Amino acid sequence: MQFHHVKSFSERAKPKDGFTLVEILVVIAVIGLLAAIAIPQFMSYHSEAIDAEMKSDLRNASIAIEAYYAKQSVLPASLAETTGFHPSGGVTVSLVIVSTNSYTLNAAKPGGTQPSFTYESITGSSH
């Protein structure tokens, strides 16, 4: 006569498939921590990129105006009279004639570190 040894429930080998709840919670906490660090940094980079876009448009507009002035000996009444300048998407560039040979440009776009930048042809600086 043969006897079969029956293992109790606690003695049976349990397959270890998947992750435990604690492991999943630790992974979620680590992902949350990384996101808390990365998202503000990304937003800062995004704002700085918008600033660079506005400053680039100011430089490009001033180059187009100077080219127009060199050819026509007069400043353009508007940026539409210049050739080759098209503002970046979402950037609004405006031209103000200060005198017969000086002007001010303003570039604005929401989302930058400041709402707009200004270029003055007299000083050659933007702020």
Q: Where are each of the predicted segments found?
A:
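N-terminal leader/signal peptides at the extreme start of proteins
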Residues: 1-19
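Conserved catalytic core of two-component sensor histidine kinases
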Residues: 28, 55, 62
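Acidic-residue sensor for enzyme active/binding pockets
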Residues: 23, 53, 66
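Periplasmic/extracellular, small/polar-rich flexible segments of pilin-like filament-forming proteins
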Residues: 5, 63-127
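N-terminal single-pass transmembrane signal-anchor helix
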Residues: 14-42
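Aliphatic-rich helix starts adjacent to a transmembrane/signal segment
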Residues: 12, 41-58
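Regular, well-ordered alpha-helical segments
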Residues: 36, 44-47, 63, 67-70
